[in-house]
Amino acid sequence: GFLVIAALLSWVAFFRVGLGGGEAFTVPVLRFIQSGALQADWALRIDTLTVVMLVVVNTVSALVHIYSIGYMHHDPHRPRFFAYLSLFTFAMLMLVTSDNLVQMFFGWEGVGLASYLLIGFWYQKPSASAAAIKAFVVNRVGDFGFLLGIFGLFVLFGSVDLGTIFANAATYLPAEGAAETGVALDFLGYALSRESALTVVCLLLFMGAMGKSAQVPLHTWLPD
């Protein structure tokens, strides 16, 4: 019931912020990490992309929950199934509302954990257990690339805050025809310019998305 209400409220937010021209805003939650140059406070970022994803996550999750009430009615472990499903929804919401890359990574890994638990829900079956372990391991390969991409962004922009990164990204590269300003990132023994560093970081972030969305070559867990 609460998830249906959340889905309806997501549509309200979509029409007000996404289509209504409402301004993006941030809702502070708590102070999280402060260590040297690294500052990552827990906050909810609400902008056009966020409200679109809130509609997708909450609407689809509400429909899945409603369908599962009948589909799982015979299973004696139904409470555990709905706990895993709710954990998956929570992790997805944490991911899409994150205000910084550290918070996003927590949601990202939460989705991976919930996927592992759901895939291996009927753990008595060897095939289900094997599929869950395979999915977990393959996704960790992609997540390693994603984590390296986060480290790279912190080195390039000096922040993990999404607002700061978005604001500086447009002016990060030198103007057309201007000379490069030295080494921006050392990666695997290579001294990368700003343009090359951004390309490598984007590929590392994409590597994480490849694992989560089962794209070649990190697709082998999906058929199982």
List where the protein language model places each region.
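...captures the hydrophobic TM-helix bundle architecture rather than a specific catalytic motif
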Residues: G1-D224
